[in-house]
Amino acid sequence: MAKKRVTLPKEFNELLTDGNIDQLKAVYNKCELTAHNGRYSLSTALHFGGVPDELVIWLIEQGLDINIPDYYGATPLYRQAILGRDTVKLLLELGADIEKPNNYGDTPLHMAAEFFHPKTVKFLIDKGANVNVENDMGRTPLASVLMVCRGIYIAQTAEIASMLLDAGAKKTSKMKERVEQIGKDFEFHRESIHPDYIEVADKGLAKLYELFDVKPVEKRLTHDGVSPIKLVEGSWEEQYEQLWSFLIPSSGPAKTVQGEVIRIPGRVRDELDRNGGANWDRDYRKMLQAMPHYLSLGSSLSDQELEEIKQVIAQIHSKENDDEASLDRLCQLALAWIKQNPNPIDLKEPSYNR
């Protein structure tokens, strides 16, 4: 008797789409029940989105372990929870382990929450899932959904958070801080969010503020493009933060040169600090190289200061350079120029795309 294959046929996804049960069962005439889609995935048919209920039942009846892990230790229940599919209900009815985590400690409830599936979250809670289980990063399902929450998912996050709290999930001070940050991020990007989502997101945000006793973040005031730009009293850091909120758009370059000389060091700092320079390319270098030109417009900085800027930007993202200090200095020089040039200067289309 010929040895059966350990991998699924290449056309398996197409067979799932067609949904012909006899053809799907016939796959296992030549394949092991544990056949998967590759050694760096190890996803069996039970892990696939769109797997028919009849095939799920048949495979388990034939002896396939309902909790079989893939390459990352994820069970079929875990994968179906990511997708928010009703297959979750079937797998639990057939005996799936509701708490079995992947290799990183995430449970199916973590995934249903992180991928914003309120119905799946409710179902898992009703079936007894532990709402305070922690993954390897020490995050509960509630902490996890707050961590990944962005813009258009605020309403789902609020609904999920409410369910988890009602089921006994514990609140922490870090969660409160995270809700405040969600509010700040939303207000900063409000202008770029599609109008169809605004009302629902606002209601969700109000719910999050209520659930975590957070003072609502004020709506952002932005520059009108024509009025003089005034700096607040305070440290250069406070002045920089004020202008960042006032002049920087949700995405893309600023409308004014004043805004752009604030945006560039901030954008570069984010890439180097948060992203480790993984996406560093010519456009980042072009952004920096544009600074001397921008700061020479209108009432220019001194020749000595412009020369200093050139030296500073030449050293950024080079070996053994203190990028933090270099970017701080760029911010300070940008603020000095803005003080000399309060009247907005329209920004011409830049040569970079960052």
Regions found by a protein language model. Give the residues of each.
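Ankyrin repeat domain, specifically the short helix-to-loop turn at the C-terminus of the second helix
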Residues: A26-L33, I57-D65, K89-D97, K122-N130, ...
